[in-house]
């Protein structure tokens, strides 16, 4: 894929296959790449990116069909997004990095780690649906973005970071990406992943069933599954301190033994230089 730098009035971007990819980056240090999910854009990662920017170079992009990235595509599928992320990393000189993905972003991250193991050092997959059985069935049949958004907010207050991005989504992006993930059986993908894999679920998530954490742990995948009991579909916004502490601890994980020892800490304090 050929990419060229792009500078809009107030944003950074790349042209990949003649399609704009908007991204933002904070901080200096080792890279971490954050990938958003079905609803919203890069913006809801800002609080976590800011916390980690003290000692990492944090990146997040708008996937095609979302935010300020290109919306001219007729199809939005996981494998195309995998190639998009690889091209994005290539153009920014990121050879290998941890991936932190949410729902759609979690599916992309796990698929990418299985296909390109040399490019990923570890994966945090947040609210990862293993297959269609773990996705709220109403999401699979709701058509418009507005109808889907109402399902997301049935049991929790909308977040401004997410709500502000809704008008910018392609009219069919949410439905098509939900269907794309639902067609996959990610249990097969997880068996191919060799790097540390942490899955995180919200215990009160109305969108992705958190009970699959038991299946992940019970079937001895090379993964650790942790449930944040009071979180819903956006754990990074519902419980930001616990989520950030968990991610910080995960960044230090190098072995399977360390991965299994991970647990949720009650407090997280920002490190100082």
Functional labels for PLM-detected ranges:
Residues 19-70:
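Conserved HGGG/HGGXW glycine-rich cap/lid loop of the alpha/beta-hydrolase fold
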Residues 135-195:
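Conserved alpha/beta-hydrolase catalytic His-Asp/Glu region
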Residues 206-212:
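Conserved alpha/beta-hydrolase "acid-adjacent" motif
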Residues 224-273:
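Catalytic active-site module of serine/aspartate enzymes centered on a nucleophile-bearing elbow/loop
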């Amino acid at each position: 894929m050929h990419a060229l730098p792009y500078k809009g009035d107030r944003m950074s971007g790349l042209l990949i296959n003649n399609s704009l990819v908007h991204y933002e980056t904070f901080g200096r240090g080792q890279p971490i790449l954050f990938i958003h999910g079905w609803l919203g854009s890069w913006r809801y990662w800002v609080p976590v990116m800011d916390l980690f920017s003290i000692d990492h170079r944090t990146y997040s992009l708008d996937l095609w069909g979302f935010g300020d990235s290109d919306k001219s595509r007729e199809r939005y599928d996981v494998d195309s997004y995998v190639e998009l992320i690889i091209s994005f990393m290539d153009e920014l000189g990121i050879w290998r990095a941890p991936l932190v993905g949410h729902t759609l972003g979690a599916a992309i991250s796990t698929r990418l780690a299985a296909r390109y193991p040399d490019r990923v050092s570890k994966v945090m997959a947040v609210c990862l649906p293993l297959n269609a059985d773990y996705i709220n069935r109403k999401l699979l049949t709701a058509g418009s973005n507005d109808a889907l958004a109402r399902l997301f907010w049935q049991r929790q207050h909308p977040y401004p970071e997410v709500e502000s991005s809704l008008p910018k989504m392609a009219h069919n992006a949410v439905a098509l990406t939900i269907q794309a993930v639902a067609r996959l059986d990610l249990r097969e993908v997880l068996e191919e992943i060799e790097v540390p894999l942490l899955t995180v679920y919200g215990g009160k998530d109305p969108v992705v069933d958190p009970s699959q954490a038991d299946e992940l742990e019970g079937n001895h995948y090379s993964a650790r599954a942790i449930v944040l009991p009071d979180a819903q579909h956006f754990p990074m916004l519902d419980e930001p301190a616990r989520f950030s502490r968990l991610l910080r601890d995960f960044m230090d994980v190098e072995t399977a033994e360390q991965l299994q020892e991970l647990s949720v800490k009650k407090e997280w304090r920002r490190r100082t230089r």
